[in-house]
């Protein structure tokens, strides 16, 4: 059975396409796992202790949060990687850019989640400000955690350029 050049090229092209799709799936899974694990924990602390939400409201917020983290995790990873290109190797620069990425992307989403879950007035303001402060401090730890999870999945840490642009 002889293969034509076109058939061989088509097979190689399909193989490369399948590998890119598999890598994108792995990137999506790694970023989603990292976001859900890290921010479910920190969200509970903020909602209960700072926003003063009831346990029922916290549960509702975490369920909504988990559902929203699935479609948001990979776009956030791409956003973070894009912003981290601006950071230089110094700790201060890494801290600044990781924190800026997290606050600018996640705080508006978080405010909507807790508002929809029942936080109003002062509780909504305190919860949103609390989340913003937490994210300022957690930006770099989350960035390091995200890089660690990506490494566990066999992916590069990101930050040089968005992983989705590697292929």
UniProtKB/Swiss-Prot annotation:
Cited InterPro entries: Ala_export_AlaE
KW Mitochondrion (keyword) present: no
Keyword annotations: Amino-acid transport, Cell inner membrane, Cell membrane, Membrane, Plasmid, Transmembrane, Transmembrane helix, Transport
Transmembrane segment boundaries: 25-45, 50-70, 105-125, 129-149
Keyword NAD: no
Gene Ontology biological-process annotations: amino acid export across plasma membrane
Pfam (any one): AlaE
Membrane topology field: Multi-pass membrane protein
GO molecular function: L-amino acid efflux transmembrane transporter activity
Subcellular location: Cell inner membrane
GO cellular component, one term: plasma membrane
HAMAP family for this protein: L_Ala_exporter
Function text: Exports L-alanine.
Family: Belongs to the AlaE exporter family.
Protein name: L-alanine exporter AlaE
Species for this entry: Pantoea sp. (strain At-9b)
């Amino acid at each position: 059975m002889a293969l034509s050049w076109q058939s061989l090229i088509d097979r190689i092209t399909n193989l490369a396409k399948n590998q890119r799709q598999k890598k994108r799936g792995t990137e999506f899974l790694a970023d989603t796992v990292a976001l859900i694990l890290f921010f479910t924990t920190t969200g509970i602390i903020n909602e209960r202790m700072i926003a003063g939400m009831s346990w029922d409201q916290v549960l509702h917020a975490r369920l909504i949060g988990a559902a929203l983290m699935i479609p948001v995790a990979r776009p956030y990873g791409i956003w973070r990687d894009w912003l981290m290109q601006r950071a230089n190797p110094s700790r201060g620069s890494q801290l600044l850019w990781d924190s800026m990425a997290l606050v600018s992307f996640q705080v508006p989403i978080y405010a909507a989640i807790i508002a929809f879950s029942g936080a109003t007035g002062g509780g909504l303001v305190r919860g949103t400000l609390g989340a913003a402060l937490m994210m300022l401090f957690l930006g770099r730890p989350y960035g390091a955690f995200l890089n660690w999870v990506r490494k566990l999945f066999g992916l590069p840490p990101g930050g040089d350029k968005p992983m989705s642009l590697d292929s």
